[in-house]
């Protein structure tokens, strides 16, 4: 299981991304639409003034139960280990072990 501090840091990043999402998208649209080079530089400078963790590319998918960052199944929100255990015990409806 991941450290609680790392999981909390990821939660904080998610909230910052959510908070600044509309502003970031608005400024990015303005940068694409602007014809003046200096205005583009100014808008880019404004974009850089946002908190570093408000950028969505700094988010990392983590398992809902354990916080494990690798082997993550997006559809279920679980890591491969937890997914396997839950599927084995029948806790994921519709998931069956394949056999052919």
Swiss-Prot record:
State the source organism's domain of life. Answer: Eukaryota
Q: Mind listing the UniProt keywords for this protein, alphabetically?
A: Plastid, Ribonucleoprotein, Ribosomal protein
Q: Fill in the subunit field for this protein.
A: Part of the 30S ribosomal subunit.
High-level lineage: Eukaryota, Discoba, Euglenozoa, Euglenida, Spirocuta
Record bears the keyword Cell membrane: no
Q: Please give a single GO biological process term from the UniProt record.
A: translation
Q: Per its record, how is this protein called by name?
A: Small ribosomal subunit protein uS14c
Family under the similarity heading? Belongs to the universal ribosomal protein uS14 family.
């Amino acid at each position: 299981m991941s450290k609680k501090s790392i999981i909390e840091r990821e939660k904080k990043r998610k909230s910052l991304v959510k908070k600044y999402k509309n502003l970031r998208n608005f400024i990015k649209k303005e940068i694409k639409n602007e014809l003046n080079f200096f205005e583009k530089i100014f808008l880019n400078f404004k974009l850089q003034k946002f908190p570093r963790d408000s950028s969505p590319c700094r988010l990392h998918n983590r398992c809902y139960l354990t916080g494990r960052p690798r082997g993550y199944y997006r559809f279920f929100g679980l890591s491969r280990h937890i997914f396997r255990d839950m599927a084995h015990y029948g806790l994921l409806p519709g998931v069956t072990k394949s056999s052919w």
